[in-house]
Amino acid sequence: MVDMSKVKLRIENIVASVDLFAQLDLEKVLDLCPNSKYNPEEFPGIICHLDDPKVALLIFSSGKLVVTGAKSVQDIERAVAKLAQKLKSIGVKFKRAPQIDVQNMVFSGDIGREFNLDVVALTLPNCEYEPEQFPGVIYRVKEPKSVILLFSSGKIVCSGAKSEADAWEAVRKLLRELDKYGLLEEEEEEL
């Protein structure tokens, strides 16, 4: 089994939905967001880019938001607090505190060893491998629901997790499967 302390995971992106519990006049909100775009004929919300934290917000008149590009849940909380403070300055009344729901977290990582993906694909259940279409094995984890892309270099991308703990659990499940089928054993060097 691979030593889990040697496996590295890094958050690349977090997407969250947010309910502000307030109706918004998007024309007024537009003035609060200097780095923003609003064209209701093309898209029904404001696309707003913040520099600190570095995230993008999709702001809808219903008071619903989508926050993307965050590297931490704290970044999302800071972005929502920053927007809420600006909205209060133009008289927006909130029925209650904003509700943040993480929808997806994307992690990149490294298992620390190389793999023969043809062997992995023929051996592991719950995976797909079409090297003409995509250079990695697509491994689906049922619980916690997520997808891991495994590349021959040992690099991985885990998406669909709702928390860092879920991502680690998904990676542990992949490693257990690889170990179960002997795919983590060191290959002997040919003489």
From Swiss-Prot:
Single GO MF descriptor: DNA-binding transcription factor activity
Which keywords does UniProt give here?
Answer: DNA-binding, Repeat, Transcription, Transcription regulation
> Could you tell me which residues the sequence repeats occupy?
11-87, 102-178
What residues form the membrane-spanning segments?
Answer: none
* GO BP terms in the entry: DNA-templated transcription initiation
The keyword Transferase is assigned to this record: no
Return the InterPro entries for the record: TBP (IPR000814), TBP_archaea (IPR033711), TBP_CS (IPR030491), TBP_dom_sf (IPR012295)
Q: Which SUPFAM superfamilies match?
A: TATA-box binding protein-like (SSF55945)
Record family assignment: Belongs to the TBP family.
Give the function comment from the record. General factor that plays a role in the activation of archaeal genes transcribed by RNA polymerase. Binds specifically to the TATA box promoter element which lies close to the position of transcription initiation.
Q: What is this protein called?
A: TATA-box-binding protein
Protein species of origin = Pyrococcus woesei
Q: Which gene encodes it?
A: tbp
